[in-house]
């Protein structure tokens, strides 16, 4: 798997060859974040949420906790870069969704373009939020893959195809 930032056609973009994320695709960030947080909430309620599919792979619950933490860190970073007041740290996925939506909804054009200070290279607030969206969407993919692995391991084998 490879993901990262690339300068393509005068624009800095985030790409992932595992989940297919491509920040060049036009998206409504508010709607994309909302849909992703809904998916995470649903996946967090799965009967296998507390089980790890493999010893080194997080459970659905652990991924959801990581997503709350990642949203908290990124929103705090972007608030700081945009000169906005700190927000209350989220304690739940719904808090993280609300805080992320508030930031996306309230940023001005100039604030979207403000540079952040978390990377050793230039990353705007916009790109930091795009990175957060990728991280969250990728973890939806990770959780679903983990649940499928658990079901394959638990079920009575009828047929298996491997690639």
Where are these regions (language model features)?
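Charge-rich, low-complexity N-terminal segments
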Residues: 15-26
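Short, contiguous alpha-helical
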Residues: 1-16, 47-88, 115-163
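A short, structured beta-strand-centered segment in the mid-to-C-terminal lobe
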Residues: 88-99
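Amphipathic alpha-helical hairpins/coiled-coils and adjacent low-complexity
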Residues: 98-101, 126
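Short, contiguous, helix-prone interaction/anchoring segments in small proteins
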Residues: 25-54
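Short, amphipathic alpha-helical "lid/cap" segments that border enzyme active or binding sites
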Residues: 30, 34-37, 97, 133, ...
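Transmembrane alpha-helical segments of integral membrane proteins
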Residues: 108-114
